[in-house]
Swiss-Prot record:
Official protein name in the record: 4-coumarate--CoA ligase-like 6
Alphabetical UniProt keywords: ATP-binding, Ligase, Magnesium, Nucleotide-binding
Organism placement in taxonomy: Eukaryota, Viridiplantae, Streptophyta, Embryophyta, Tracheophyta
Organism: Oryza sativa subsp. japonica (Rice)
Binding site for CoA: R318, K498, G499
Binding-site list for ATP: S232, S233, G234, T235, T236, K240, Q389, T394, D475, R490, K581
Amino acid sequence: MSKRSPPPQPAHIPMAEQRWRPPYPYASSAAGGGGVDRRSRSGFCAATRTFHSLRSVGPLPPEELPLTVAAYAFSLLSSAPPLVVAGRGPALVDAATGIAVSYPAFVARVRFLAGGLWCSLGLRPGDVALVVSPSCLDVAVLYFALMSIGVVVSPANPASTADEYAHQVRLSRPAIAFVAPEVAARLPRHVSRVVIGSEVFDRLASASAAGGWAAPPAVAMKQPSTAALLYSSGTTGRVKAVAITHRNLIAQISAYNAIRETVAREAATDAGKGKPPPPSPSPPAAVTLFPLPLFHVMGFGLLTRTISSGETAVVMRRFDLAAAARAVERYRVTKLSAAPPVVVALTKSDEARRRDLSSLVAIVVGGAPLGREVSQRFATVFPSVQIVQSYGLTESTGPVATMAGPEESAAYGSVGRLAPRVQAKIVDTATGEVLGPGRRGELWIRGPVVMKGYVGDPEATAATITPDGWLKTGDLCYFNEDGYLYVVDRLKELIKYKGYQVPPAELEHILQSRPEIADAAVVPYPDEEAGQLPMAFVVRQPGAYLTEQQVMNCVAKHVAPYKKVRRVAFVNAIPKSPAGKILRRELVLQAMASTSRL
């Protein structure tokens, strides 16, 4: 399975010498907050028409310092809770089996596996490794091992089809793929692969541990170098490979830790005033349950942040509500990271009520906004659990707005305030006017978390990121006078099904390729549990016979399960603008009107 001949023995640098230690003071002016009236709770600067984060910032290493996100994360463990330092606090736990990996063991496994990747497979900085597997402990170790030697991690959904993998391979051009056994046959034949959990995979780490291979040399990666290629759907109907840098991930870790410290400081201040402290989402023994897949930006980013903070990640292979409730009870989970459908399900679950969930103090919600009504219903059922809404994109490496502390968590309907070092604008899409608090427009963001760009697609990159670094989110939003961000609607046409992005154009292309179908359009249909369902409006060819089930089946065999069409309506024509653009809003209103008549 050797990719290249083993390299000559390198000159070794002890791993400890790579570690970044945070002695660097952070200049507050670098946050871009100049001109902001600090008495303004919105963070809006009238002179620049820009919203600035008013949160405290943590140390961030100089951008010119060579540093991988793995080395940065491990460097922070020296300040981790005492249980971690003593080797008793697990880094990872398998939710199903209870197998736990301590922090010393995790760091050792990463280094041993990195040695096998370097010496046996000949992987080098800049190579791309496709990783296709359900979430598991091996995948978490593999991510860090790859990034520690400068190899670009490219996680993909194990539920994707052969056609979808072929497209992703064309984008990322992987040197090798690490795959789950059930996925291997769906990859293009020319891609070299190692099956995760196989004897070959296990030998990569075990041979290093036995001294068979030397440790890899210290890799002097520039922080703006690509660390990961994450896949994001575009409205064109084809996924794009989003280039996330080491700097992006390091900045997210820094922001996460700064917010944790702020919450802890405010709780200590309240305690000094005699106020009863609220439960902390990040106590010394913080344990986070990962029902979201590690290939998703939420799971991928949260893993790096959890490890760097010395917290425990409880990994689920796939989400199941009953299993999640059991895991919370068994492992005393303090924090649950989830998409809105999970919140809805918890409020209705008898299983959740039967379990002891008293350890849970926060549920971190992302992927789509959580409605005020659902938030209030959840608070009624679980009054001691904070809802921590966050907002972000794959293109922003995860959250650019979030909630911190009980006061912010009570702002139902909002997705929180800007994260440290993030700037934002609200832009009128019709006039280009930059708007102030209370005005609705497209959200633009800027900061060290913004992606490098779309791989192999300079036109899409230029259309998404302005020359001065502003990322156009495609979401209709506004800030209120207190700096809370509200997501009103999606300017992008993506359908958000259980936190996944479903591009309607991709489904329309499949439908329109059928000879029995004259025209078709796919729109989001509101659903309390899933968020949105893909609904197809279909125009049959004259004389053609086609049932709703046949329409759903013809799409299902070409796409991953989360992209399936869930509702179908037959119509005489698809409403379009003079330019031929589908008028999706008319179809959504038509769907809602027909439902209300039932």
